[in-house]
Amino acid sequence: IDKYISEHSLGAFRPKAVLFDMDGVLYDSMPNHAVAWQKSMEQFDIHMTADDAYATEGARGVDTIKKMVKAQQHRDIDEEEAQRMYDVKTSIFHEMPVAQIFDGVKELMQKIKECGMKIGVVTGSGQRPLIARLINDFGDFITEERIVTAYDVKNGKPAPDPYLMGMQKVGTKPCETIVVENAPLGVKAGVAAGSFTIAVNSGPLPDSALTEQGANIVMPNIKYLADHWHEIVR
């Protein structure tokens, strides 16, 4: 925190909002996403590994598909074709068991709320059922007006745009905002937006994959963050 304060020439760190990524931060959904990505892309002769799914997590799905097609099939596809391919991935994902909320998420949100801070969610997903689930699961803490989806921005993560849009929705400046992420692209987006960025390493990637993108702190899981929350907003 002291390093962040000095790097951004701040007198003190007084956060007013927390912006959460969704998959891999609020929900233990990344294993399902990895399987859905692999199975769906096989249908289009695209080879995608579980590690690829984790490494590209946070980006708009259509952007990931465009890059994979370009790299493996050496052709450019438009948004419409990428969306059709992404719809197959979405369909497979929704046939899988419902991902559980990570232990500690609601406890953390309660602590944030008690601090008088706002909460938003910034996701690369554009799936309406997932947005509805967010409201259902976390309605005590967030509103739909404070959720940023793939459809709210032209440039997805790792561009800062999704988190800048999130700040606009919660009404804070970058130096007043904490971003909680689990993916390298998401961390890069949070850092690029100027936020204090906490990485929760809930996946198989090494911590270095997150620190290399500029994460200010890396924590092993969201429960650990909940338990140590008051050390961050001291």
PLM regions with names:
Residues 58-93, 103, 111:
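A metal-dependent, Asp-based hydrolase signature
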Residues 59, 115-116, 213:
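Structured helix-beta-strand junction loops
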Residues 1-16, 80, 110, 126-234:
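Asp-based, Mg2+/Mn2+-dependent phosphohydrolase catalytic module
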Residues 2-52:
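Active-site neighborhood of HAD-like aspartate-dependent phosphohydrolases
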Residues 6-9, 14, 94-121:
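Short, acidic loop-to-helix structural element flanking the phosphoryl-transfer center
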Residues 34, 61-66, 86, 105, ...:
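A general structural signal for well-ordered alpha-helical segments in protein cores
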Residues 46-55, 73-85, 140-144:
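Short, surface-exposed acidic
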Residues 42, 113, 191:
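Anion (oxyanion) recognition and catalysis
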